[in-house]
Amino acid sequence: MTVATASRMDFVRAGRAQPVHLDIGRDHPFLHRAFAAVCFGVMLAGAVMLPAFTVAGVQMRAILPVGLLTLFGILYTNEAWAALHGQRLLLALLGGLAILGAFVSYMYGTPANDILFAVVSIHVQAAVVLLAAAVVARISGLRAAVIATLAVIGVSAVVATLQMLDVSAAWSLRTTFAHMQHQALDELEFFGNRRPMGLSFSPIQLATQLTLAFAIFAAAREKERRATTGVTKTSDPAVILALLVFFAACLATATRSPILGGFIFLAVYAALRRAWWIAMTIIFGSLLAYLAWPLLMETIQSTSPRLTRTDDNSAAARLVFAYYGLRLFLDNPLGYGLVFQPYDLWTKYWTDLYMMRAAHGAQENDLHNYVLSMLNFYGIGILLFVPVLMRLLRNAGAYVIFFIPYFIHIVFHNSGPLDNDTIIWFVIGALSANVVARRKPARRRRFAPREPSQYGGPALAGAGASANRLRLMSPRYGSLQARGGFRAP
């Protein structure tokens, strides 16, 4: 072992006894970090609240990421290159799917202009948003990006809660946002039945955003804990509290799939962390819910009646969509391309569908199933990218568990990566920002020379070795990258 390696080991041993504090985004001046945090929040707010707002025919949610990526790429070139390098595997996946989608669309007979527009609006936009979020988050720091995300989505959730309580001002505010985006109110079923959606484009979009808000908060908490205390198997009470808030917000949207995903996450989390107190909380909570069930149901059914029903057309139509989507895939395994609309093909299958309850859903809606939608968009060729996807999930490691509510939710809706969901790229980009664990400088003291047998090499010269150790303990070497950090895909 070399002298430098032995000296570095001495430094690590000495630093273990020192207090640890988080230093997130501290490499940049405060004003730079504050400006980046504001930019991240504005960019996210445009995607959440005004996704269809256009300027000169171009959507604002596309203008902001392009502009901010260009600005921060010029001002912080090194950070931009680092973000590009960190996201290279995910960017390669987006590029591969763009090529596959374009090829499938061409083979299906889609016009070239439509193919180009679809590739730009789906894959290129996803790549730009991902890089913009990653670069800005590297400047602002992970914590600031998380706070901005929770603030933007939290505002929409609060407005949705007021809408659930039938506060007219909350509905008027949403109507104003709809007019700004030229959203036809008479064409939205959600406005007809006054289903709460906050300031998001739809209740489904808000539910998707809530799952991602929970995911980024819980993953960031886990990331910080690992950076300060190392890999831990203990549960985090803050995550459980966040889950309860998440459940309450989902009640406002009257969307069932995120709640189902939340309970599945809770079971998996309790099992992996061996947290008996979570199990006891579930038991006592279930007992309390049983005793308060009549009052609880009366309250919920008066505000969100669909939440407690499993026999409505929305639930029954899921079987229709699953059967219809599977039939479409089996009849054309090569796929239908990026502009595929399943409700354009229902007549061929109507003889098999019309006897099913809520069969008319196939005439009017998309498949409401993320997996089947992807298979029909890209065809069986998408299976070639499964190894890349598995590697990305493996790189994410223990943080994948916090996305369980998101995964469960998109299975039942027209939402997900590359399918009506831009916010996922903000979350992935933000979580790729480094969490740096800095150790306070140890006492400046001279180390006694080690014996040769301790390092398997020549004895260290006393004065030279001590000087080398003190050099390693200088501020230049005062930062250790936590092993448990979120590895960028």
What annotation goes with each model-predicted range?
Residues 298-378:
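Long extracytoplasmic/lumenal interhelical loops at the membrane interface
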Residues 51-64, 112-121, 201-208, 234-270, ...:
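Helix-loop-helix junctions and helix-breaking kinks within/between transmembrane helices
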Residues 69-72, 277, 397-410, 414-464, ...:
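Transmembrane alpha-helices of multi-pass inner-membrane enzymes
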Residues 103, 158-168, 253, 270-309, ...:
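A membrane-periplasm/extracellular boundary helix in multi-pass inner-membrane enzymes
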Residues 146-179, 184-253, 259-271:
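Alpha-helical transmembrane segments of multi-pass inner-membrane proteins
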